[in-house]
Amino acid sequence: MKFNFWKGLWKPKSLTPTLSHRLYRRMYTPQPPLNREMTVLDRSKFTVSLNLALAKFPDPKYIAQFAKECKADILQLRSINHVQKTDDNGRAVLLRHDLDLEGGEDVASKVMSQLSPRGKELLTEAQADITKIVKDLDYDFWRADEIFYSVLPVTEKDEIPSGFSMVGHVAHLNLRSEWKDYDRLIGQVILDKNPRVKTVVNKVDSIDTKFRTFKMDVLAGEDNTEVEQHESGCRFQFDFAKVYWNSRLHTEHDRLVSLFRGEASSRERKQQERAKRENHEKSTETAVEPDNTPATAVCDVFAGVGPFAVPSGRTSLFVMANDLNPYSYEALEHNVKLNKVSEYVKCFNLDGAEYVQQSMKLLDEHRRTQPTINPVQVRKRKAGQPVVKQDIPNHYSHYVMNLPDSAIEFLWSFKGLYTTVDGLSQDTPLPHVHVHCFHKWEAGEEEPSKEETKAALLERVYKQIDVRLDPNEVGMHWVRKVSPKKDMFCISFELPKEVAWAPQVNKE
């Protein structure tokens, strides 16, 4: 294989598009001109004129055959159709973009010498007319990362800050300080290149430890952070600038809701099977209505706008949901109504520790005023299928604490949980507590093992509840990598009886 350098790149002389030739074509993908002095977007500076070969077929029937049998010879640039209409309403095919069209020799001969044998054969048979045209690739042609590589002072494309998360119509960036001079340009390009995006914002401060919100700067688009987000089959409406929402946690939301629903479904199936057996044994014309089954109660301590609570309510889980942020609480109540789960999700606006300490009392008060609820799925039941109403239970099966920066520091509030209401016995089932938390390590340190991480997290738990947990009885689920030296986990454990029945404590 012989190579020569053309426009700074090696080019195979082979007439057949081999693996090396295809590698070359990937290398010689057109790129916008460098504009490293630009800090304000000027869309006119990104036009590139590309010389292309156009093969006009007198008989259009050859076009489909040529495209099918000679794919390596046709143009394969995104958003450019290789079939073109000519001035006389005929049809022509653009040939691959890496053909060398420079030099004084005849264009047709030069092109034919670079095509595959089958391509040359078909073009000759069809008596195709080959000419050279100029195609302008303007700003609209380039992807966002190509524009950024053209403008930003980077040497590698993996350094480009092109990643963002979507929350409704808002693109959320977290730009490093080095891109401050380019932030408006970056925002405008993201707005231009993503049709779903109407607003681009950048995080300008660290997350507020009280409400988990952060200050944001609108870089491009509408100054509107009122969004609608769809997740887990639910609709969520909120002001992204005033509440906490992380789209990267949707898998974790689904995981825990599925866990809760799985346990509840198992219990409900057993109840329905028992009722079916009783009906069969009695053989009466009138079906025996099954006894009510206790609902599964979930306590969401840091509920936000409802990503755990609302999907849980849609699956007939009974949820007592709380958030301290008044804007989150307002959005939570709105989303509960929006998704028609008001019977299953009750909302509160309290401090997390105060809410945990009052949670059993709040549950008891609710079950006294509304002891029974109808399942959400009743409307979908089959004809003849018995209606299984649900009783509000006297205890929670699960507590969710999704405040990873400090949730562990709230665990002390579980002390004396079962001493706050009357009527509980030592046999009352204990809840499972699911605590989200961060674990980080210093620069220069090796990433800790799973065992080391769990030990460190359980030591933090011990300092709050004064009871050592058996590592083998504690689940630890890796949620996501927050930064190179920081991971997010969810640790799950059954609340020890010594904690639930301990004297209640108060911290100022």
From Swiss-Prot:
Enumerate the catalysed reactions: guanosine(37) in tRNA + S-adenosyl-L-methionine = N(1)-methylguanosine(37) in tRNA + S-adenosyl-L-homocysteine + H(+)
Positions with biased composition (Basic and acidic residues)? 267-284
Question: What UniProt keywords are attached to this protein's entry?
Answer: Cytoplasm, Methyltransferase, Mitochondrion, Nucleus, S-adenosyl-L-methionine, Transferase, Transit peptide, tRNA processing
Function, in words: Specifically methylates the N1 position of guanosine-37 in various cytoplasmic and mitochondrial tRNAs. Methylation is not dependent on the nature of the nucleoside 5' of the target nucleoside. This is the first step in the biosynthesis of wybutosine (yW), a modified base adjacent to the anticodon of tRNAs and required for accurate decoding.
In Gene Ontology terms, what is one molecular function of this protein? tRNA methyltransferase activity
Q: E.C. number, please?
A: 2.1.1.228
Xref: InterPro entries: MeTrfase_TRM5/TYW2, SAM-dependent_MTases_sf, TRM5-TYW2-like_MTfase, TRM5/TYW2-like_N, tRNA_Gua_MeTrfase_euk
This entry carries the following GO cellular component terms, namely: cytoplasm; mitochondrial matrix; nucleus
Q: Which residues are involved in binding S-adenosyl-L-methionine?
A: 253, 323-324, 351-352, 402
Its family remark reads: Belongs to the class I-like SAM-binding methyltransferase superfamily. TRM5/TYW2 family.
- Which BP terms in the Gene Ontology apply to this protein? mitochondrial tRNA methylation; tRNA N1-guanine methylation
Q: Where is this region: Disordered?
A: 267-291
Does the record's keyword annotation contain Magnesium?
no
Q: Which Gene3D superfamilies match?
A: Met-10+ protein-like domains (3.30.300.110), Vaccinia Virus protein VP39 (3.40.50.150)
Task: Please identify the protein, giving its name as recorded.
Answer: tRNA (guanine(37)-N(1))-methyltransferase
Q: Where is the transit peptide?
A: 1-53
